[in-house]
């Protein structure tokens, strides 16, 4: 049974975890997978301007009903521009904006040893503890 297309923003570390995002997109395009979504994520934002990036991310987050957070190795690492971002890094910013927008949170922990973004803790997120379709679908249904 196919799930109806959920409007999902995917929060991930572009430098280190984009392959996981691309895998979600591939599942979405493959009828053999139950995982299906209306991708509200941004393409790479072609700007170094913090306020431009914030505005683009916020607009896309506000178009979504769900936010999937891919928790990779660097997910809670302090960004060099954290003071300007207003959060430890971009993923923490995206989680905070998702919570403000009322998005349901789904966290996918790639490795149990990876530190979760601080804004994800005590957020009521639904968790998947492996990057598998079954674990992710269960977390999506429980969100």
Task: Please state what every model-predicted region is.
Residues 64-65, 102:
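Short, well-ordered alpha-helix to beta-strand connector turns
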Residues 100-106:
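A short helix->loop->beta-strand "cap" motif at the edges of active sites that frequently abuts
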Residues 1-7, 111-143:
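C-terminal interaction surface of TIR/SEFIR-family domains
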Residues 1-63:
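Conserved N-terminal substructure of TIR/SEFIR domains
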Residues 75-100:
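Conserved TIR/SEFIR loop-to-helix hotspot centered on a Trp-containing motif
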Residues 17-20, 76-79, 113-119:
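Short catalytic/ligand-binding loop motif for oxyanion handling, primarily in non-cytosolic enzymes
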Residues 12, 71, 109:
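Short beta-strand/turn micro-motifs composed of small residues
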């Amino acid at each position: 049974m196919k799930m109806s297309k959920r409007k999902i923003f995917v929060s991930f570390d572009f430098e280190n975890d984009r392959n996981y995002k691309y895998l979600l997109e591939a599942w979405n395009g493959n009828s053999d997978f139950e995982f299906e979504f209306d991708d509200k994520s941004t393409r790479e934002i072609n700007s170094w301007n913090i306020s431009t990036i914030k505005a683009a991310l916020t607009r896309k987050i506000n178009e979504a009903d769900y936010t999937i957070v891919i928790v990779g190795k660097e997910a809670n690492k302090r960004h060099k521009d954290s003071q300007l971002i207003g959060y430890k890094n971009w993923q923490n910013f995206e989680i905070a904006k998702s919570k403000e927008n009322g998005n349901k949170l789904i966290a996918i922990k790639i490795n149990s040893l990876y530190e979760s973004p601080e804004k994800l803790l005590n957020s009521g997120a639904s968790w998947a503890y492996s990057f598998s379709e079954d674990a992710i679908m269960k977390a999506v249904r429980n969100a």
